[in-house]
C-alpha cells in the first residue's frame, strides 16, 4: 500500500496513511479538531 509523503494534509480518516506521522500544529490536545479542519500534515516519524 502506498503511503502519503511528508507535507500531505492528513485527516482523521487517513492519518494512518502517512509514510511518517500525522503532525498537528497545536499538539495532541487540539488534535481531533485540527485533523477535522485540515491543519495536520504528514511529517517525519516521531
Curated annotation (Swiss-Prot):
Disulphide bond pairs: 3-19, 10-22, 18-42, 24-40
Principal cellular location given in the protein's record: secreted
GO MF annotation terms: toxin activity
CC annotations in GO: extracellular region
Pfam family, one: Toxin_28
Highest taxon, organism lineage: Eukaryota
Keywords attached to this entry: Disulfide bond, Knottin, Secreted, Toxin
Function comment: Insecticidal toxin. It inhibits insect voltage-gated sodium channels (Nav) by partially blocking the channel pore in DUM neurons from the American cockroach, not by acting as a gating modifier. The inhibition is only partially reversible after prolonged washout. In vivo, the toxin causes flaccid paralysis followed by death when injected into Heliothis virescens larvae. It also causes uncoordinated movements followed by full paralysis to sheep blowflies (Lucilia cuprina).
Entry's free-text remark on domains: The presence of a 'disulfide through disulfide knot' structurally defines this protein as a knottin.
Name assigned to this protein: Mu-segestritoxin-Sf1c
Species for this entry: Segestria florentina (Tube-web spider)
